[in-house]
From Swiss-Prot:
Belongs to the cytochrome c-552 family. Substrate binds at Y213, H261. Catalyzes the reduction of nitrite to ammonia, consuming six electrons in the process. The lineage of its organism: Bacteria, Pseudomonadati, Pseudomonadota, Gammaproteobacteria, Vibrionales. Heme c 5 binds at H272, C311, C314, H315. The keyword Ubl conjugation does not apply. It is found in: Periplasm. Heme c 4 binds at C279, C282, H283, H390. InterPro entries: Cyt_c552, Cyt_c_NO2Rdtase_formate-dep, Multihaem_cyt_sf. It catalyses: 6 Fe(III)-[cytochrome c] + NH4(+) + 2 H2O = 6 Fe(II)-[cytochrome c] + nitrite + 8 H(+). This is Cytochrome c-552. GO terms for cellular component: outer membrane-bounded periplasmic space.
Amino acid sequence: MKKQWTRRSAAAIAMVTTLLLSSHSFAASENNERVDPRNEAYAKDHADQYDSWRSTSDSVQIEDALAEDPNMVILWAGYGFAKDYNKARGHFYAVDDVRQTLRTGGPTDENSGPMPMACWSCKSPDVGRVIEEQGEDGYFSGKWARLGSEIQNPIGCADCHDTRSEEFKNGGPALALTKPHVERAMDAIGKPFGDQSRLDQQAAVCGQCHVEYYFTGKTKAVKFPWDKGTTVDEMEEYYDEIGFKDWTHKVSKAPMLKAQHPGYETWRDGIHGKNKVTCVDCHMPKVTKEDGTVYTDHKVGNPFDRFEDTCANCHTQSKEMLQSVVATRKAQVLKMKLTAERQIVAAHFEAGAAWDAGATEKEMAPILQDIRHAQWRWDYAIASHGVHMHAPEVALEVLGTAVDKAADARTKLVRLLAKKGITEPVAIPDISTKAAAQKALGMDMEAMKAEKKHFLETVVPEWEEQAKEREARDYEPM
């Protein structure tokens, strides 16, 4: 095992020699100083920001979203999210959580495992460092495990700030996009980062990760599907035109799309986005210490936890009243979410029954397209964290169209099934719990958990040891 990862490290070093040949290299910089991805390196000069960032480690609890809503196991059948899907924790846990999820499997060497390198892209400031050193092709190529020892530090300072700039060193924010695919995405929607206002830049740095994206090309590089715009319809049209699918559904065989977390897109369409109230206004407010010092709180969290520093800056209503409004909107979105899920789950099983009854690809094509569109719209709404607050009207409208699309699919399926001699309702197996739903799909969860356990106990310690040695060699001690 040791030799396998050592060889990979040597190969990564050798690859640096080719970085200037990369067609999308991000290595060019006005400052030749090596970027330091270690968040602790900024603790002394930016103590308040660092201490508040470190407080994101307070979110220790892991909440199992599949256990809460087993429908999602079926909706993602055949895809990694059916294995596990936990609600997001604080930035402090970004690297740990992606290592521990069953979705990344249990690779035993640099070439094994189910996921590409791109899965690190929103987890660490080491990503920007590696892209600078090896170019985009050098970073994205290969499996997720290939550069496991290089991605060590969780989401932090160098993800959103130009930490090498004089502005940052003198206490200024020096906001920056640190990944070239994000710069291209902003250009695509006519918002080059350098031309953006300070408020837009505050949202854009969050939009490096809190967005919809997909993996493209031989290297499975990250791309935002914004060529036609950022609405659910525009991105759907884009995906359809290029014939993209994330996976083929295990039950219905539909060519599926998996929305990631389009928070930036839904925020733009919501009341706050339209009024230039940005992510940091609500989630990272400026706070005043007892000595009068003002700083930006980097403990990204619920605005109601710091009501006087967030909501009360604009709203005259009481905290209790606003909490009631948000709770009502959340309940409305949840109700429509579950309605859409029931329809789409049924459509998947009915499509499976149609295949079993001898349906042809030609007969199924329009049905599968309806299922694809229905679930894309459902996912776009539910994967956008906080959409009930950011843009509840968008969520309800999009979920409504998801129900309509699913109903279209089921109407066509009723006719097709009748044509095949099936007039009784299609039976749906027990999916009342996460375990039952995974069993219905024939998933060997114990084997997956054992594989992950072995990976965490054998491979991850080697990654951490190699990262420690590299950082000791490349950076000044803290």
